[in-house]
Amino acid sequence: MEIHRLNSYTSVDYLCNSSNNVYILLGDTDEFINKRIILLMNNIELYYVYEISVNDEDELYHSFITSNVVCPIKQRINLMLYKEYKKVIGSCVINNEGNIKMYSQPDKLHVYVLCYRCNGDIKTITMIKCHQLLKPEKEIVIDGYQVNDSSFFYTSPNLIKQINMDKSDLFYKNILLRKEINCLIRKQESSNLYCILNKHIVSLSDTDIWKVIISDELFDSSDIEKLVKFDYDRDKFHAFVRAWYSGQLSNCKEENETIKTVYEMIEKRI
């Protein structure tokens, strides 16, 4: 998946591009969204916005926010419903209140979908925005070790619930959503976020063009480096830790006890 700095990204001519485009937006990238809207202003047939957050069971859920058309029966819309609705009734009701707004809540992802006509077909630009990468306001210490890196929690976000910190719920949800973004970038086939997008928000296919767009202020940060380039799958981490443990053992009993203590501590925290 291509990764681009916001101000260095060269736009494409969407009206000459037969593929659907999907963008993962990290940081304050409202400028990018607005530019896509302006580029396609005269060709947009449908646009809509959803939000994705985390419920009390720590599961992702989606909510419809707004659109330029209304489906009175469903009280929501997406491209799949739009096509179905047009077949039955012939047209949808224009929603004059459905203006696109920019959202920045750190405990939500916002999905902007622009649907436009291209060579007689409806094509889509889908933009999945994670507006903020939160950091703890105070120093965090776990098992005597100072945690300076938020990516520490990607393999096990539930550790945050065990820490006495301000706004822990907000930080927890932000980390969980970032973990889902990481999975979407690194291995779509097992991504819960991909499933929600494809089933409830916009149809995705193997021919879609995916790109990551990162705000200038975040592009060179270590948070971004680890979010987009590393795999935080827990099973892989467990396998790595077990392999490390086996490789460290020797004929020295005292040294093996120390290694075992460290191994058990790490295994417990993953």
UniProtKB/Swiss-Prot annotation:
One CC-aspect GO term: virion component
Pfam families: Pox_D3
InterPro entries per UniProt: Poxvirus_D3
Keywords, ordered alphabetically: Late protein, Virion
Record's subcellular location: Virion
Induction pattern: Expressed in the late phase of the viral replicative cycle.
Bilayer-crossing regions: none
Family: Belongs to the chordopoxvirinae D3 family.
Role description: Late protein which is part of a large complex required for early virion morphogenesis. This complex participates in the formation of virosomes and the incorporation of virosomal contents into nascent immature virions.
Protein name: 27 kDa core protein
Naturally occurring in which organism (per UniProt): Fowlpox virus (strain NVSL)
